[in-house]
């Protein structure tokens, strides 16, 4: 599904004190510093053992090259989140039904529409509600025309779940993975 994005994507978005810029290889060093800053939080967020304690900057560069390619090919949106011009987080945006493997989709496809979009992300130094509210506001308006936005999280990210409740994102889709259950909120 390559037609889910507007023709022109913003190079910078400032909203609620957060700055979003495309996640590109040019940001490898500041992104790496943000990733290495709180490994336990990112493992809880990612739902696996990423990043490892010995996660090398070369692997981070490979990730950024892949994310940049995904954005260029219109497979996903990937933005760094900056606070005071420093990388402090990331968001990942893609069509909901394309973000899970076929095994997981059996439970999802009946409850989700083809145009539904899922957003997930992490941020240091600000409450989760700030990131989620900014993303839902920005991506829920022009130039985007998504039928529905879902925020993806899991039980390990209690701050994100609480933020979803506070923002009244109470429609819930759950997808059981190998080790945990992913929860989407709209």
Features from the language model and the residues they span:
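Conserved A3 ("GATE") glycine/threonine-rich loop of ANL adenylate-forming enzymes
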Residues: 134-135
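Glycine-rich phosphate-binding loop
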Residues: 126-131
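GNAT-family acyltransferases
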Residues: 1-125, 138, 142-186
């Amino acid at each position: 599904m390559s037609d889910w994005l507007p023709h022109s994507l913003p190079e910078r978005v400032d909203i609620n004190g957060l700055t979003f810029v495309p996640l590109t290889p040019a940001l490898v060093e500041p992104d790496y510093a943000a990733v290495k800053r709180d490994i336990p939080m990112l493992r809880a967020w990612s739902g696996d053992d990423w990043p490892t304690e010995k996660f090398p900057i070369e692997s981070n560069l490979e990730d950024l090259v892949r994310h940049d390619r995904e954005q260029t090919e219109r497979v996903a949106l990937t933005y760094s989140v900056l606070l005071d011009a420093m990388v402090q987080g990331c968001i990942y945006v893609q069509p909901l039904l394309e973000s899970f493997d076929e095994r997981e989709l059996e439970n999802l496809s009946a409850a989700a529409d083809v145009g539904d979009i899922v957003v997930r992300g992490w941020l240091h130094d600000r409450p989760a509600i700030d990131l989620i509210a900014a993303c839902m506001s920005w991506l829920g308006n022009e130039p985007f025309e998504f039928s529905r936005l879902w925020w993806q999280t899991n039980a390990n990210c209690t701050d994100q779940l609480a933020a979803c409740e506070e923002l009244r994102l109470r429609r819930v889709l759950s997808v059981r993975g190998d080790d945990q259950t992913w929860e989407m909120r709209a």
